[in-house]
């Protein structure tokens, strides 16, 4: 299931911050507001992306150089001085798309025939371009419909997956070496993930890991034998007389899971023989005795690797550190190098155990884990010791470790001003943990409170990406003194364009319930007047570890609703939400569909009490988990909401995948948590939908939250005699993102809200 923390888009113009309220670009008096002749941000503006936010995507290729695509040329830039040269001219890409350059910059992968599969996976064809010869390599080409391909960390070796088997090219012009031969569609996956590992565990299609100096290639093998298949029709072109049927091995809650094996192959041995024997590293006994997952792989050094394994009930994980035995040509994972991580209140990590960050010699590492108070902080694991020492602490959370040098560790946290929805870059001295400095907090505090960072290879330079609350800003910095070297992109052109638009403002604040702060955001109409009454739309996700109230910038559907329709669009992070400690996040452990649903209802009540919300025009909408919560809220009989929209909702947790669902709910068996599985369905609340207006939307080719989920809601509502609206999107997946479907769904939802709120 898509988690909102992974996705950052954008919301208003360059903003000034008044305490915790962002305000529009241009401040007008009431008289001036009444005479404001500027146009509003329209639905067409959103659907056609009239106003585009610019980013600056760079690829570090050394500790002081990076590549950047400009006007279809690939430029090589010097970080210190800013001078650039053309690395690849745009004529190289006339028939192909740029994919990646080898670490030694001698070869470039060019991609074509791209075909999307699931969220991350796709197939494509590739050509290899010789930079020095300025021509394509025509001998020993990579096969069409390759599933994954990646350069080695040094030089120009290639590993790729074709027809579920792994191949390696030692030189681009030489024949490929076949590493595996067991691959079988929908059964055995070598070096790539099956559906559930792609979506819920690795968040990627790749299951290949090169060692730092290319000597070894590690890979996972997934076996889906016995995993039940989900099947659905794909209607395709209208000339197709019989629809196609799509089959996917998809383990639902309580069903047979894929099994996993882990191997390492010595690539250097390929030079002396046509094949190399992979060596299997088994899971530790404490997890291997039952169903389990491989959830993280990190090379510490050329001959040391870290593997994290997780029990199917995801409150127990083991990190095994394995070393290469040069004499016996084997890998050893001694028990004294195993580190157990457990949770007694919920699950391990936010979505899985955090990855370790090793020192350069691989002897010790740093990792984000929960401290004794339940906040995610950085702990240092010294050499040959199982216990760790926390180097950060407080009632806030470290989001990610971004870089580790011999002297400092760099991390992103939400410590600044005790605002969970903020993100800033910090550095901490490894020899003195009291020496902590925020590198971004004071750079541009009105415009920038939500940062991301990208470090060069050895962290000598870094790019800061400010993602809000004002317009995104990208700058380049030097680590030695943190001087800003140059502005890479400031979105000044967009700023000028938005001066002529009546933009909404954004309020980020909290309410206190049961002595606990819960944060919310509101997108307020232009010239907001708290003495007036506005319709309210609650935009909800509310899944475990989600966050909707943050300081990032967005131009989206809510921008249109607030600017043109004068609707307040609010989001609330209640119990179950993330980045505020395990007490809040684990509150919904083993009881999805309860507290997070109640909290959205209570939030709406609190918003009405603020005085500027029309209590008779309150709506709710959400997508995916948000569609589930929307439906559960509307089916609660609370009397708070007039209408709502659920897009691609879960309706019964036994219908959803095992990895995600069981993380929070356990198993749907009588000995575990079957009762709550059965008591948390949307269908059981069908009778209460007579009190509300309901729009149900789903794509027929949703591989993630299957159409079955909405079909069962529809059936229950019909059986209960409920009048409701429904819309399906033929052959659309979970994102309903094709150009025509995207425009249609947002137009349709807009019309539904206009009718519900009596706007036109």
Curated annotation (Swiss-Prot):
PTM comment, free text: The soluble form (Dipeptidyl peptidase 4 soluble form also named SDPP) derives from the membrane form (Dipeptidyl peptidase 4 membrane form also named MDPP) by proteolytic processing. N- and O-Glycosylated.
Q: How does it sit in the membrane?
A: Single-pass type II membrane protein
GO CC terms on record?
Answer: apical plasma membrane; cell surface; endocytic vesicle; extracellular region; intercellular canaliculus; lamellipodium; lamellipodium membrane; membrane raft
Give me the disulphide-bonded residues: 322-333, 379-388, 438-441, 448-466, 643-756
> Which EC class heads this enzyme's classification?
hydrolase
**Where in the cell does this protein reside?**
Cell membrane; Apical cell membrane; Cell projection, Invadopodium membrane; Cell projection, Lamellipodium membrane
Q: Which residues cross the membrane?
A: 7-28
Q: Name one Pfam family in it.
A: Peptidase_S9
Extracellular-side stretches of the chain, per the record, are 29-760
In alphabetical order, the GO MF annotations are:
aminopeptidase activity; chemorepellent activity; dipeptidyl-peptidase activity; protease binding; protein homodimerization activity; serine-type endopeptidase activity; signaling receptor binding; virus receptor activity
Keyword NADP applies: no
Q: Which reaction does it catalyse?
A: Release of an N-terminal dipeptide, Xaa-Yaa-|-Zaa-, from a polypeptide, preferentially when Yaa is Pro, provided Zaa is neither Pro nor hydroxyproline
Residue ranges in the Cytoplasmic topological domain are 1-6
Glycan attachment sites: 83, 90, 144, 213, 223, 315, 328, 514, 679
Residues the record marks as active site: 624, 702, 734
Protein activity control: Inhibited by GPC3 and diprotin A.
Coiled coil stretches, renumbered:
none
Which GO BP terms, alphabetically? behavioral fear response; cell adhesion; endothelial cell migration; locomotory exploration behavior; negative regulation of extracellular matrix disassembly; negative regulation of neutrophil chemotaxis; positive regulation of cell population proliferation; proteolysis
EC number per UniProt: 3.4.14.5
Could you describe the subunit structure of this protein?
Answer: Monomer. Homodimer. Heterodimer with Seprase (FAP). Requires homodimerization for optimal dipeptidyl peptidase activity and T-cell costimulation. Found in a membrane raft complex, at least composed of BCL10, CARD11, DPP4 and IKBKB. Associates with collagen. Interacts with PTPRC; the interaction is enhanced in an interleukin-12-dependent manner in activated lymphocytes. Interacts (via extracellular domain) with ADA; does not inhibit its dipeptidyl peptidase activity. Interacts with CAV1 (via the N-terminus); the interaction is direct.
Family of this protein:
Belongs to the peptidase S9B family. DPPIV subfamily.
Q: Relate the protein's function as given in its record.
A: Cell surface glycoprotein receptor involved in the costimulatory signal essential for T-cell receptor (TCR)-mediated T-cell activation. Acts as a positive regulator of T-cell coactivation, by binding at least ADA, CAV1, IGF2R, and PTPRC. Its binding to CAV1 and CARD11 induces T-cell proliferation and NF-kappa-B activation in a T-cell receptor/CD3-dependent manner. Its interaction with ADA also regulates lymphocyte-epithelial cell adhesion.
What is the recorded name of this protein? Answer: Dipeptidyl peptidase 4
């Amino acid at each position: 299931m898509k988690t909102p923390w992974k996705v950052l888009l954008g919301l208003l113009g360059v903003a000034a911050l008044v305490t915790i309220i962002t305000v529009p670009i241009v401040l007008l008096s009431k008289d001036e507001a009444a005479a404001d002749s500027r146009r509003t941000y329209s639905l067409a503006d959103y659907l056609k992306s009239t106003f585009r936010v610019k980013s600056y995507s760079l690829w570090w290729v050394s500790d002081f150089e990076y590549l950047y695509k400009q006007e279809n040329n690939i430029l090589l830039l010097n970080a210190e001085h800013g001078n650039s040269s053309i690395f690849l001219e745009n004529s190289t890409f006339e028939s192909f798309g740029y994919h990646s350059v080898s670490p030694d910059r001698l070869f470039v992968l060019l991609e074509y025939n791209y075909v999307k599969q699931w969220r991350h996976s796709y197939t494509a064809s590739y050509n290899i371009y010789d930079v020095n010869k300025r021509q394509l390599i025509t001998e020993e080409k990579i096969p069409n419909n390759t599933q994954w391909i990646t350069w080695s960390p040094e030089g120009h070796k290639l590993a790729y997956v074709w027809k579920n088997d792994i191949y390696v090219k030692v030189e681009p012009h030489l024949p490929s070496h076949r590493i595996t031969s067991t691959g079988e569609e929908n059964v055995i996956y070598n070096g790539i993930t099956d559906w559930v590992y792609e979506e819920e565990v690795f968040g990627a299609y790749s299951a290949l890991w090169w060692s730092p100096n290319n000597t070894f290639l590690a890979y996972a093998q997934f076996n889906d034998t016995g995993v039940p298949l989900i099947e659905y029709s794909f209607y395709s072109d209208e000339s197709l007389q019989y629809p196609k049927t799509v089959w996917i091995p998809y383990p639902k809650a309580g069903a047979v899971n894929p099994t996993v094996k882990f191997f390492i192959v010595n690539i250097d041995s390929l030079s002396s023989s046509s094949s190399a024997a992979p060596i299997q590293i088994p899971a530790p006994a404490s997890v291997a005795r039952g169903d389990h997952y491989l959830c993280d792989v990190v090379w510490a050094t050329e001959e040391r690797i870290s593997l994290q394994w997780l029990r199917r009930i995801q409150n127990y994980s083991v990190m095994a550190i394995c070393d290469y035995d040069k004499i016996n040509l084997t890998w050893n994972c001694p028990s004294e190098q195993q580190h157990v991580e457990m949770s007694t209140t919920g699950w391990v990590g936010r979505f899985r155990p955090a990855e370790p960050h090793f020192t350069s010699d691989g002897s010790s590492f740093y990792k984000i884990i929960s401290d004794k108070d339940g906040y995610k902080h950085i702990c240092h694991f010294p050499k040959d010791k199982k216990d760790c020492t926390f180097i950060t602490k407080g009632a806030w959370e470290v989001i990610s470790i971004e870089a580790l040098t011999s002297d400092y560790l760099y991390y992103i946290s939400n410590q600044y001003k005790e605002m969970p929805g903020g993100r800033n870059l910090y550095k901490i001295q490894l020899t003195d943990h009291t020496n902590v400095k925020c590198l971004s907090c004071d750079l541009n505090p009105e415009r920038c409170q939500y940062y991301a960072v990208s470090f060069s290879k050895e962290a000598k330079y870094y790019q800061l990406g400010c993602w809000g609350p004002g317009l995104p800003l990208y700058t380049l910095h030097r680590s030695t003194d943190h001087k800003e070297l140059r502005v890479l992109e400031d979105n000044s052109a967009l700023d000028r364009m938005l001066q002529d638009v009546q933009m909404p403002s954004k309020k980020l604040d909290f309410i206190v319930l049961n002595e606990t702060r819960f944060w919310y955001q509101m997108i307020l109409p232009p010239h907001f007047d708290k003495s007036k009454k506005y319709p309210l739309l609650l935009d909800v996700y509310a899944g475990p570890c989600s966050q909707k109230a943050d300081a990032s910038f967005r131009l989206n559907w809510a921008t249109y609703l607030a600017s043109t329709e004068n609707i307040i669009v609010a989001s609330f992070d209640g119990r179950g939400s993330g980045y505020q400690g395990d007490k809040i996040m684990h509150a919904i452990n083993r009881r999805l569909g309860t507290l997070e649903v109640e909290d959205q209802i209570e939030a709406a009540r609190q918003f009405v009490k603020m005085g500027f919300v029309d209590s008779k025009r309150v709506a709710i909408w959400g997508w995916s988990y948000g569609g589930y919560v929307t439906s559960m809220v509307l089916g609660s009989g609370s009397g708070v909401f007039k209408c709502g929209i659920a897009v691609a909702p879960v309706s019964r947790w036994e219908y959803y995948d095992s990895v995600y669902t069981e993380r929070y709910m356990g198993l749907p068996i009588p000995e575990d948590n079957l009762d709550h599985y059965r008591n948390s369905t949307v269908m059981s609340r069908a009778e209460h939908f007579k009190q509300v207006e309901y729009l149900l939307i789903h794509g027929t080719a949703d591989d993630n939250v299957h159409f079955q989920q909405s079909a069962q809601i529809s059936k229950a509502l019909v059986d209960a005699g409920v009048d409701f609206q429904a819309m399906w999107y033929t052959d659309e997946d979970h994102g309903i993102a094709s150009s025509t479907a995207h425009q249609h769904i947002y137009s349709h939802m807009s019309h539904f809200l206009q009718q519900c709120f009596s706007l036109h």
